[in-house]
């Protein structure tokens, strides 16, 4: 039986295992034939959407890995706008509105509100937080 999943990632790209574990879990459930509709990045998890992140050559590039997963499997990557702006992650529109010199949101990620999280959670069979 195939299930629809939604993930919420609250851990940063680096510093603890939550984001890495979420990515590994996402890959595993897709390999098993399940569907992953949305990954919502909240709290420190918004750092997973910072395109300026530059890990060492021997580390997994989680930002690009999430992007690749989303492209390959049509997964929506939503980033809590309030949490992102608070932590210095912004898209071009918000940077312009806030009179900042540039944006750093990785392509493939989208700033959104908690309403997107609620919609995703209501539309899936399993909701898992990392």
From Swiss-Prot:
The active site is at 80 (cysteine persulfide intermediate). It holds the Pfam family DsrE. It is an enzyme of class 2 (transferase). It comes from the Bacteria. Disulfide bonds: none annotated. Keywords: Cytoplasm, Transferase, tRNA processing. It is found in: Cytoplasm. GO terms for cellular component: sulfurtransferase complex. Its EC number is 2.8.1.-. GO terms for biological process: tRNA wobble position uridine thiolation. InterPro entries: DsrEFH-like (IPR027396), Sulphur_relay_DsrE/F-like (IPR003787), Sulphur_relay_TusD/DsrE (IPR017463). One of its GO terms (molecular function) is sulfur carrier activity. Gene3D superfamilies: DsrEFH-like. Part of a sulfur-relay system required for 2-thiolation of 5-methylaminomethyl-2-thiouridine (mnm(5)s(2)U) at tRNA wobble positions. Accepts sulfur from TusA and transfers it in turn to TusE. Heterohexamer, formed by a dimer of trimers. The hexameric TusBCD complex contains 2 copies each of TusB, TusC and TusD. The TusBCD complex interacts with TusE. Belongs to the DsrE/TusD family. This is Sulfurtransferase TusD. The gene is tusD.
């Amino acid at each position: 039986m195939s299930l629809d999943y939604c993930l919420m990632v609250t851990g940063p790209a680096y510093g603890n295992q939550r984001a890495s574990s979420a990515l590994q879990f996402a890959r595993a459930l897709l390999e098993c034939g399940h569907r992953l509709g949305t990954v919502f990045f909240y709290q420190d998890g918004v750092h997973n959407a910072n395109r300026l992140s530059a890990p060492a050559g021997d580390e997994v590039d989680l930002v690009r890995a999430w992007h690749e997963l989303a492209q390959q499997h049509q997964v929506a990557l939503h980033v809590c706008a309030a949490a992102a702006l608070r932590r210095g992650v912004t898209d071009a529109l918000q940077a312009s509105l806030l009179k900042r010199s540039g944006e750093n949101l990785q392509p493939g990620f989208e700033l959104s509100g908690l309403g997107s999280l609620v919609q995703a959670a209501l539309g899936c069979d399993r909701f898992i937080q990392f």
